[in-house]
Amino acid sequence: MVDDSTRKTLSNIPLLQIRAGPREKDVWVQRLKEEYHALIMYVKNNKQSGSDWFRLESNKEGTKWFGKCWYMHNLLKYEFDVEFDIPVTYPTTAPEIALPELDGKTAKMYRGGKICLTDHFKPLWARNVPKFGIAHAMALGLAPWLAVEVPDLIEKGIITYKEK
């Protein structure tokens, strides 16, 4: 079900242990430390392998996340804003990652630019609570979505390259 490349990526992202969401204020701080550690390791591994593709930051409480993600297609870099909130029932409920500027441009998206992850990612997340975190959502949710949807949107002329 999971290919070798995905398995290798996953093996380089630390699994999380603390089961806490934003409502559990004291324990949430510990969970956030685990989240940041996993994200730092994932980004570091991406840079080392030449596949750096996103930047994220959060508000002080760690409940709102935002940043940029990008996808390379035919040697052109397509960049998108990315954002998501941590659900109050996290980590039982996965974050809903949104790319607001692509809202309404593909059927594999919900209102507000939230990408569709129900068929493949959410069952995997549910089997791995509380071990999966934000880095896993990026690796197993957003990355494959970008790899499938962005080239299709480019080929259809729905999104075009913007000079920087």
Curated annotation (Swiss-Prot):
Cite the active-site annotation.
Answer: 116
Q: Which keywords, in A-to-Z order, does the entry hold? A: Ubl conjugation pathway
Question: Would the keyword Disulfide bond be found if you checked this record's keyword annotation?
Answer: no
Query: Is Cell inner membrane a UniProt keyword of this protein?
Result: no
Classification via Pfam families: UFC1
GO BP terms, alphabetized:
protein K69-linked ufmylation
Q: What does this protein do?
A: E2-like enzyme which forms an intermediate with UFM1 via a thioester linkage.
Name-wise, this protein is Ubiquitin-fold modifier-conjugating enzyme 1
Which species is this UniProt entry from?
A: Drosophila persimilis (Fruit fly)
